[in-house]
């Protein structure tokens, strides 16, 4: 039977998913499995590398079983992954030497501070497009090498491999046959030069990582590995890889200069397509590789919010004011406004445009009249307010005035949040019919490489609008919200600094 589907593996921060797409980019089947979050110390976040892959393999099989689809019907596999999360494993056995250190983890903040004192921040930003922060992979690799007994010696002897989650999944799907990554993931490690498209020896020396550990960097859309026949009954090409946010940008058909999307997931991630050359930021945005296709490199400006939808999980699991995430919109809608309450969810610091790793969460403006609804409303509004800070910074960097913002991710289904986002930004907020754009993006990349789809024009034609939210808030109300929000951010800033 001729291949009729692309299988996208979407390895996220809290769950692994497999999503089957047909030629019209419709979702045929979804399978999902959550995995364990490990918090060894305050500010530390880890995953089990084996559980990451095992959960991904399970949903791969479950998706095909539920869809009643055989391996012969799969044209290609695409892989999207949580970025920056760092895994180090033994080359000979494939055994991890330590848990995966997750992108949210802050244990290397002091090392990054020292690099800043040593004058390395400018070199790193100039070569990588990134700000010097514990968020990125390089300092996490160094921590493993310095703190796992014997790891540094093994790495120096060429016995250890490093990879972001995409590399780890490909390594295991290929039965240890292929050690690769793509430029979108490599550009998030703080070790990759986005101007030369190569690992950079000066950066590797700064973070103390041997080059022998690093994966080969291959185009995001290319025949880059073979899935071992054990998984599909035959060899199937892995033909698309991208970090989750770059994948979502591609899946939202933001393929042209000036188009932007925001993903409302665990964090919020706004990417603005800046075309075929990197654009340096003067306003604390990240310059990153968007993807590499047959047409060459595309770049983006990115603003990263560490805590977006995760604030909803905190209200559910930490405070217990909701029992299920689906209750959030209803509860926030029980009050007409935030009642003067502002929440800054800086649980692990503030991301763009502040990059304050010592900020911590605050709720300000509480009175005896404050209720659960006000807290829920303030949390909802905080997601959109953080996004607006990023949009304002990007417009200063580029001079590009957005006319629309495409959205995806779980929280994009919250109509109150989307309307509030439109009101704040003053532009149309467009939610697509298929909000699984992360998976769709790597399906597109894999499909392009294998001829499943012909070109990007065909892909753009497959994007369909579900709902458009138009701004309607009076300007004076918007100005008041922004003024009070920035006052609240000032209260949260530098909280842990002595």
Curated annotation (Swiss-Prot):
Q: Which UniProt keywords apply?
A: ATP-binding, Glycerol metabolism, Kinase, Nucleotide-binding, Transferase
Pfam families, alphabetized:
FGGY_C (PF02782), FGGY_N (PF00370)
**A GO molecular function held by the record:** glycerol kinase activity
Mind telling me which HAMAP family this protein's record contains? Answer: Glycerol_kin
Q: What is this protein called?
A: Glycerol kinase
Q: What EC number(s) would the UniProt record show?
A: 2.7.1.30
- Binding of ATP, residues: 13-15, 266, 309, 313, 410
Regulation acting on activity, per entry: Inhibited by fructose 1,6-bisphosphate (FBP).
Organism placement in taxonomy = Bacteria, Pseudomonadati, Thermodesulfobacteriota, Desulfovibrionia, Desulfovibrionales
Q: Where does glycerol bind?
A: 83-84, 135, 244-245
Q: Which reaction does it catalyse?
A: glycerol + ATP = sn-glycerol 3-phosphate + ADP + H(+)
Question: What family does this chain come from, according to its entry?
Answer: Belongs to the FGGY kinase family.
Q: Where does ADP bind?
A: 13, 17, 266, 309, 410, 414
What is one Gene Ontology biological process annotated in the Swiss-Prot or TrEMBL record? Answer: glycerol metabolic process
**Which species?**
Desulfovibrio desulfuricans (strain ATCC 27774 / DSM 6949 / MB)
Root EC class: transferase
CDD domains (UniProt xref): FGGY_EcGK_like
Binding residues for sn-glycerol 3-phosphate, per the UniProt record?
Answer: 13, 83-84, 135, 244
Q: Organism's domain of life?
A: Bacteria
Q: GO CC annotations?
A: cytosol
Q: In which pathway does it act?
A: Polyol metabolism; glycerol degradation via glycerol kinase pathway; sn-glycerol 3-phosphate from glycerol: step 1/1
Quote the function comment for this protein.
Key enzyme in the regulation of glycerol uptake and metabolism. Catalyzes the phosphorylation of glycerol to yield sn-glycerol 3-phosphate.
Q: Which InterPro entries match?
A: ATPase_NBD, Carb_kinase_FGGY, Carb_kinase_FGGY_CS, FGGY_C, FGGY_N, Glycerol_kin
């Amino acid at each position: 039977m001729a291949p009729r589907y692309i299988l996208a593996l979407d390895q996220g921060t809290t769950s692994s998913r497999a999503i089957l797409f047909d030629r019209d980019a419709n979702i045929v089947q979804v399978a999902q499995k959550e995995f364990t979050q490990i918090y060894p110390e305050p500010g530390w976040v880890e995953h089990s590398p084996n559980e990451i892959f095992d959960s991904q393999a399970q949903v791969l099989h479950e998706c095909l079983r539920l869809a009643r689809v055989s391996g012969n019907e799969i044209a290609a596999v695409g892989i999207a992954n949580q970025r920056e999360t760092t895994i180090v494993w033994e080359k000979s056995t494939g055994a991890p030497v330590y848990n995966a250190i997750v992108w949210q983890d802050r244990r290397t903040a002091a090392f990054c501070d020292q690099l800043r004192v040593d004058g390395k921040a400018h070199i790193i930003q100039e070569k990588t497009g990134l700000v010097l922060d514990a968020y990125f992979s390089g300092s996490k690799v160094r921590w493993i090498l310095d703190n796992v007994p014997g790891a540094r010696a093994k790495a120096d002897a060429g016995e250890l491999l490093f990879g972001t989650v995409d590399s780890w999944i490909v390594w295991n799907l290929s039965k240890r046959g292929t050690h690769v990554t793509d430029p979108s993931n490599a550009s998030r490690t703080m070790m990759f030069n986005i101007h030369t498209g190569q690992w950079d020896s000066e950066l590797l020396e700064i973070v103390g990582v041997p080059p022998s550990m690093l994966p080969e960097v291959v185009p995001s859309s290319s025949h880059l590995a073979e899935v071992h026949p054990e998984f599909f009954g035959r060899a199937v090409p892995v033909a698309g890889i991208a970090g989750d946010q770059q994948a979502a940008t591609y899946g939202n058909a933001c393929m042209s200069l000036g188009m932007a999307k925001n993903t409302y997931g665990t964090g919020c991630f706004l990417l603005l397509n800046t075309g075929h050359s990197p654009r340096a930021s003067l306003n604390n945005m990240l310059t990153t590789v968007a993807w590499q296709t047959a047409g060459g490199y595309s770049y983006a400006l990115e603003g990263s919010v560490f805590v977006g939808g995760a604030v909803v999980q905190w209200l559910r699991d930490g405070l217990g004011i909701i029992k299920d995430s689906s209750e959030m919109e209803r509860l926030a809608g029980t009050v007409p406004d935030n009642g003067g309450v502002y929440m800054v969810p800086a649980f692990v610091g503030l991301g763009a445009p502040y990059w304050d790793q010592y900020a911590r969460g605050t709720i300000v403006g509480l009175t005896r009249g404050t209720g659960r609804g006000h807290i829920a409303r303030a949390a909802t509004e905080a997601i959109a307010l953080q996004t607006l800070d990023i949009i304002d910074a990007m417009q200063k960097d580029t001079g590009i005035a957005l006319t629309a913002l495409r959205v995806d991710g779980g929280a994009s289904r919250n109509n109150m949040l989307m309307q509030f986002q439109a009101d704040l930004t003053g532009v149309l907020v467009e939610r697509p019919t298929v909000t699984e754009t992360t998976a769709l993006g790597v399906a597109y990349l894999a499909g392009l490489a294998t001829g499943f789809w012909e070109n990007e024009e065909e892909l753009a034609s497959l994007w369909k609008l579900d709902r458009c939210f138009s701004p309607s808030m009076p300007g004076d109300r918007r100005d008041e919200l922004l003024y009070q929000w920035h006052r609240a951010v000032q209260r949260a800033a530098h909280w842990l600094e002595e």
